[in-house]
């Protein structure tokens, strides 16, 4: 499975997630080999997740995609009819959105890299993993753009680079260059390159432009190759920093890193930008995904005068 996952350009995280779901599927069916099972067993497992484990629709879809990968890509079963699965219910939850003042207050409570990353989440609409995976070459200071490479959906997109972040980002890249120079001096400095680019461009892995904008403090072993490399900062560090900032700022919302992205979209719509523009900046394939923010705009009767107020 590992070789096929790498050939299909699955991220390491997706590969591990699929492997865990396939393992659960096998154990659910008494440790029988998947090739000895069929669509009926897949239906039973997915229905079990919805009915007995009460998983969310997104979790059930994740399991479905893992099994689809197993049968179509690994076992080469093109015909796999799994109609009739009991689907988990989609909960219609509105996203948590910060006010502009709240977003600014939260960012002000954060320090160093975490503050800069939060600024990119809110100012550029990045997902947390898109932010921590940014490479030096993805930032275009001259054009005021950020290229989001192969984000969710395997499609590159362009979003804005906030003017207020240009100077702190330049300072961050100076730190990265110094760290990279030191790594090279010690015999390291090669970074993971996606899609077998390392085999195509032998020396690219050590080029500064491919380095992460937010590198980890310590070197670590790459689980793909066993080589010692410098990975990017952990997204969990940023998540914890956001939770701490929420508490210190006294903001009583169940916010997270993704709330900055929600706020980015909502505030653009409030400022009069059209939904298609926001869709492109967010990288949504379907405009219906972006439409959820119009519900946030209308929440609480916003824009409608209460009869109690005369």
Feature-to-residue mapping (PLM):
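Conserved catalytic core of the tyrosine transesterase superfamily
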Residues: 1-310
């Amino acid at each position: 499975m590992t070789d096929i996952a790498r050939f299909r350009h699955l991220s390491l995280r997706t590969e591990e997630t699929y492997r865990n779901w396939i393992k659960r599927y096998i154990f659910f069916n008494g440790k029988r080999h998947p090739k000895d099972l069929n669509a009926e067993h897949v239906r039973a497992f997915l229905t079990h997740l919805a009915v007995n484990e009460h998983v969310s629709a997104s979790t059930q879809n994740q399991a479905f995609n893992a099994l689809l990968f197993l049968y179509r890509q690994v076992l080469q079963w093109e015909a796999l009819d799994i109609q009739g699965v009991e689907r988990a219910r989609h909960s219609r939850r509105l996203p948590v959105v910060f006010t502009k003042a709240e977003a600014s207050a939260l960012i002000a409570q954060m320090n160093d890299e975490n503050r800069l990353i939060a600024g990119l989440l809110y100012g550029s609409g990045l997902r947390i993993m898109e932010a921590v995976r940014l490479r030096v070459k993805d930032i275009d200071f001259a054009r005021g753009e950020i290229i989001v490479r192969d984000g969710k959906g395997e499609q590159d997109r362009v979003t804005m680079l906030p003017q207020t972040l240009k100077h702190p980002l330049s300072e961050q890249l100076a730190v990265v260059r110094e760290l990279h120079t030191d790594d090279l001096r010690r015999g390291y400095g090669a970074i993971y390159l996606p899609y077998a680019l390392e085999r195509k461009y032998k020396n690219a892995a050590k080029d500064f432009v491919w380095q992460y904008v937010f590198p980890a403090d310590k070197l670590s072993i790459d689980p793909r190759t066993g080589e010692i490399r410098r990975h990017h900062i952990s997204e969990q560090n940023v998540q914890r920093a956001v939770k701490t900032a929420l508490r210190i700022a006294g903001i009583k919302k169940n916010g997270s890193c993704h709330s900055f992205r929600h706020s980015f979209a909502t505030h653009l719509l409030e400022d009069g930008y059209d939904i298609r523009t926001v869709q492109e900046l967010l990288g949504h394939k379907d405009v219906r995904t972006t439409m959820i923010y119009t519900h946030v705009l209308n929440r609480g009767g916003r824009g409608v005068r209460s009869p109690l107020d005369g």
